[in-house]
């Protein structure tokens, strides 16, 4: 991605299975995030990044609907959640910070209660920011850490995180973690 050095391209092999066949990595995300035909996914991040592109494709794979923002705007995102009754979304911590900086009268005028899962990733989220988001949106925040290369991931729900603030969660998708100092 170029966030920590020279931009790189990650060439992944094409999946040779027919479209409707369940692929383990897609099925794992579907089970974790409960994608189904009732899913309405808000994509506030650019599709040239692997994560938003992948989540959009997975939503469509399981019969859901995607709402793609042309560019990120905090109030517009809240408006879209209410307008489309968004059930799933994906964010980076900077977006949380920007939404929390909106005047309270703006934040509270939109109904965001349709959300079942608000996924966040890409960078560590400050504890105070994540606490404020969970207080505002409820325990729908789900965090994951992973790499474009597909070399493993961790995931944590709001409930787990509130018990272990700052944790990155547990290994996901049969991944084996090695913690080194």
Residue ranges, per PLM feature:
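Short beta->alpha linker loops
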Residues: 72-73, 94, 124
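Active-site phosphate/pyrophosphate- and oxyanion-stabilizing loops and adjacent acidic/basic residues
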Residues: 27, 97, 131
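Conserved AMP-binding/adenylation subdomain of ANL enzymes
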Residues: 15-40, 44, 48-88, 102
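Short Gly/Pro-enriched turn/cap motifs at secondary-structure boundaries
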Residues: 165-171
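Gly/Ser/Thr-rich phosphate-binding loop
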Residues: 1, 61, 86-91, 100-164, ...
């Amino acid at each position: 991605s170029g966030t920590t050095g020279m931009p790189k391209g990650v060439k992944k092999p094409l999946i040779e299975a027919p479209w409707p066949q369940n692929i383990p990595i897609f099925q794992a995300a579907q089970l974790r995030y409960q994608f189904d035909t009732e899913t309405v996914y808000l994509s506030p991040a650019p599709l040239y990044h692997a994560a938003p592109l992948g989540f959009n494709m997975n939503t469509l794979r399981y019969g859901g609907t995607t709402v793609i923002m042309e560019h990120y705007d905090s109030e517009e995102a809240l408006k879209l959640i209410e307008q489309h009754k968004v059930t799933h979304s994906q964010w980076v911590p900077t977006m949380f910070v920007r939404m929390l900086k909106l005047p309270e009268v703006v934040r509270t005028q939109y109904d965001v209660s349709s959300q079942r899962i608000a996924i966040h990733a890409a960078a560590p989220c400050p504890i105070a920011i994540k606490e404020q988001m969970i207080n505002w949106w409820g325990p729908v925040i789900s965090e994951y850490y992973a790499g474009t290369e597909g070399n493993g991931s961790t995931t944590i729900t709001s409930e787990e995180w509130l018990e272990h603030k700052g944790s990155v969660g547990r290994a996901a998708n049969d991944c084996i973690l090695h913690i080194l100092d």
